[in-house]
Amino acid sequence: MTEKIIRFNDVHICTESFGEINNPTILLIMGATASMIYWEEEFCKRLSNQGFHIIRYDNRDVGKSITYEYGHPEYTFEDLADDAIQVLDAYKVDKAHIVGMSMGGIITQIIALKHPSRVLTISLIMTSNFDSSLPKKDNKVTKALSELKIRNWQDKDEVVECFIKKSKVLIGSKHIFDEE
């Protein structure tokens, strides 16, 4: 695994890559408030061992990438999609298989629409396209998730507590949640 910081337009994005750059690339885009490490290292290594070049990265306001004043993001979903293209450019990748989870899936869809020539395939996990005909999220889930904010990413206890609360909401009622 190799870490690389990509800098452009007063933005810096932290990336990590696995495997040979000449192999077909899979770009992994995680969701809101989730670091690239949610794409576990073992998962990335297994994909690279199958002949792929893997890139994972932290979106803005997450992990080692640029952060903004709390509650005042200075970017849009389209900017996040353009960030992904900047990542591909930094690795000199013309086209990639793009995998997006949650908000990463929204970013992936925007990439496919704005930059179709850069996309080999897309894979979407736990995401939506905001079509008004789709069923809506339960209001208590939306409310709970909107109230869970991490104000200090350097405070490990705050981060862990927030992710436990978030996971508790997302697990639903079918399974027992183990906080340990």
Description of each model-found segment:
Residues 2-8:
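Short acidic-hydrophobic surface loop/beta-edge motif
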Residues 102:
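Catalytic nucleophile serine of serine hydrolases
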Residues 62-99:
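Active-site loop/oxyanion-hole signature of alpha/beta-hydrolase fold enzymes
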